[in-house]
Amino acid sequence: ALTNYRRRHLGYVFQMYNLIPNLNVKENIEVGAYLSDKSLDIDELLKTLGLYEHRHKLPNQLSGGQQQRTAIGRAIVKNPDILLCDEPTGALDYNTSKEILKLIEDVNQKYGNTVIMVTHNDAIKNMADRVIKLRDGQIRKDYTNEVKIPAQELDW
C-alpha cells in the first residue's frame, strides 16, 4: 500500500540528480511517466522545463542546471500531489540555483502540487508559504510567511 501511495502521489527531486546515464533527457523523464496513470504530456513538460531542444542529449552532455531540470521533470511528469525536493540547488551555482527555484515555483503554480523543500539555504525560506525549521531532529520554528518573495528576487 505504501509503495502504491508513493508511486501515485509523490515525486522526488534529489540533490544528486540520479539520472540514468544511457537514457536521453526525454527517456529519463519518461521513466517517471510510467509510474502514473495521470502523467503529464512529456513534450509540453520539456518545453516548460526549457529542455525541448535538448531532449535527445544524454546526461553527460548537459550542464548541471539542465541535469537538475531533467530530474525535476522526471519527478513531476507523473503529476504528483506532493513534490519532495532534497537540496535541489545544493550542487548548483547562484544563477542556476535561482533558475531552478523559479522552475519549481512555476511548476507549483502551473500544476498545483504541494512542494516540500529541504534546504540549508536560509534565504529560500522566504519563497515558502510555510516554514518549518528543524535542528537536531526537533522542530524549532513553524510559521506561515505573510509575504512571500518570488524566487527571482531572492538573494544570498
Where do the protein language model's features map onto the residues?
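ABC ATPase NBD coupling module
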Residues: 1-11, 149-153
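Conserved ABC ATPase signature
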Residues: 4, 58-68
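Short coil-to-helix segment of the ABC ATPase nucleotide-binding domain corresponding to the Q-loop/switch region
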Residues: 23-30
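Conserved ABC ATPase "signature" region
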Residues: 38-53
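Hydrophobic anchor residue at the start of the ABC signature
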Residues: 72
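Conserved catalytic motifs of ABC-family nucleotide-binding domains
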Residues: 79
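Catalytic Walker B motif of ABC-type/P-loop ATPase nucleotide-binding domains
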Residues: 83-86
